[in-house]
């Protein structure tokens, strides 16, 4: 057990000062995730809330602390320079004028009543400008607190940019905040030949480089500049102290209305282009920064979205299919009762939704997984099998090859009256499922109760912004996992733009896409969503390599704008 394992909250509450890291939610520590899971209140800037909220329990109160997002007109606290902050109590159901407090008062107010408060800050609490003041306020108010360190941007961002700060020779490393650095500080780091990590803003990089040159650094000293570090919006430029201003202008980064964005600049030989080109592991991911549309139900999209993120992509889940109960539930009710009374030898699940439908009926009747005792269970696909295991049922049969109805039939044993006391199979399925499994089981000698367990209907249209992005080329790729997702997406949102890469799970889905005027760029080698994601990543890797070999910049598909609409492929 960790020595920092959470104790019961004291009467006056408990505050955890938590480092949220530089931006990638995957960089949160195990201790941070534990603290977030037990929090009653989250206190943080909006961008930090976006990083930590996925690990918080449902119903946690969120308190944004940035006045730009909450109320740009809020004044500073008198005499402190600290912005006054809106208190947003997520436990309140009434709408009223929020109180205005400084950060310390906000944390204290959130801790009242014995609540666990997580005060999340970007990077590490030890480097936050106001965290120490808030800790002292906790001491004065008798509120216990703890500190959960996080990865500081000055360390995490260079690692994601492919710039190691030290090597075997143990070179000196200096960290400078350009906003507060004194002339003496610049003189000291300028006289050193070690690596310098500068925290600054995009429009102040050139000025910081000038300070280092004035202090003695050579103008040809290598320099990297990274913006939005550790996120899929990360961009890194390589230059020298003397050329950084010109490099950013040529890249059309400056001048920019976003010049105030924070950046991390690394000065020294570790930033040399020859070395960084080999070590830039993050930005060289096959689909880095790609916005990928995943038109599926939210329940089905989670694992696929995680896989896409591992390739550097930004998945955007758009439900195209909604699941509803059958219009006439009596058939389903009789079948579930038949499971209990011994009517079936087998039950076959072909989707997660089928498992969910049966489970809901079980719960309605007060049943649980024990009702499957004596019944053989089959499942198509890893996700369906996982849903059964989560229910407490381990499937007896999963296709050894193709994860489809056809694959299940190939492995299904024929009915044998000697070994099979019952000849009937319960098949709960969607109202639009194919008849492949039913026909195959009948051919093997089984009787099949083919029962509509749920209906699939077209989902509501996505927000207007998403529809415009689909039709206007805002997405780099779209993944179609069935013919119905093609038809439904086009029906509720319109046809994807011609620059969007179209990826399909199999020939039938590809044929439907072509019938809708889309050219299919990627097709999975086998009908699996994860194989489809792998195929799309391979496509992205080949595309990236081709650009590098041609001496062209690596761009995303959405950064191209050819005039002609994509037509159906004739090859």
Task: Please annotate each region the language model reported.
Residues 108, 112-115, 126, 130-140, ...:
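Active-site/ligand-binding-proximal alpha/beta "capping" segment
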Residues 25-28, 126-132, 151-157, 204-208, ...:
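Short glycine/serine/threonine-rich phosphate/pyrophosphate-binding segments
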Residues 183-226:
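Conserved anion/nucleotide-ligand pocket segment
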Residues 49, 69-82, 147-158, 171-183, ...:
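Conserved beta-alpha
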Residues 14-18, 115-121, 173, 194-198, ...:
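Generic beta-sheet signal
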Residues 39-41, 61, 195, 477, ...:
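Well-ordered beta-strand positions
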Residues 1-148, 342-354, 372-373:
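Class I S-adenosyl-L-methionine
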Residues 126-145, 159-163, 359-363, 490-493:
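Short Gly/Thr/Asp-enriched flexible loops that form oxyanion-binding sites at enzyme active sites
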